Amino acid sequence: MQALLFISYGAILGASLRWAIGLLFNPLFSSFAFGTLIANLFGCLIIGVLLGLFWQFPQISAEWRLFLITGFLGSLTTFSSFSSEVVELFFNDKWLNGFCVLMMHLFGCLAMTVLGIWIYKICLNFYLNPIHFGFAQLNQQIHRYEIRVIAYIAKFFVSF
């Protein structure tokens, strides 16, 4: 029962933030719901940061994981809204818009999750080694990650 409360409290906050993001960003574009994309991208970025944190510190309680990932970010990011918006575009014969929205959500969310993990790792390295951590080292780390991402993307497109 206690786990359900943690999930519920997180879900209230996540759903409220998602609603506010939709109100703010959806009017910007008439062709698709930009707020849903922003909510999903932002949520995936935060999920990446939290994954890095939880991997580094597995002793963080299950309640925090339930509150943050299952509750808050589970209700902030939304697969159902995303899928209904894409299907609506397809049913209205806006195939190109639908496909573009689909790709932006899919690849954007994956990229933001990876970026969140990198942000966490970079911040952790800076926190642990503030004197020895300089811009040259930061650039080297970013370059190593960029090479990995480019390799993964190339493998993905070659697989077709």
From Swiss-Prot:
Record comment: activity regulation: Na(+) is not transported, but it plays an essential structural role and its presence is essential for fluoride channel function.
Reaction(s) this enzyme catalyzes, per UniProt: fluoride(in) = fluoride(out)
Record: residues binding Na(+): 74, 77
GO biological process terms held by the UniProt record: cellular detoxification of fluoride; fluoride transmembrane transport
Molecular function in Gene Ontology: fluoride channel activity; fluoride transmembrane transporter activity; metal ion binding
Principal location listed in the UniProt entry: membrane
Disulphide-bonded residues: none
Any one GO cellular component localisation term in the record: plasma membrane
Topology in membrane: Multi-pass membrane protein
Entry keyword set: Cell inner membrane, Cell membrane, Ion channel, Ion transport, Membrane, Metal-binding, Sodium, Transmembrane, Transmembrane helix, Transport
Short name of any one Pfam family annotated for the protein: CRCB
Compartment(s) of residence: Cell inner membrane
Membrane-spanning segments: 5-25, 34-54, 67-87, 99-119
Function in brief: Fluoride-specific ion channel. Important for reducing fluoride concentration in the cell, thus reducing its toxicity.
Family: Belongs to the fluoride channel Fluc/FEX (TC 1.A.43) family.
Protein's recorded name: Fluoride-specific ion channel FluC
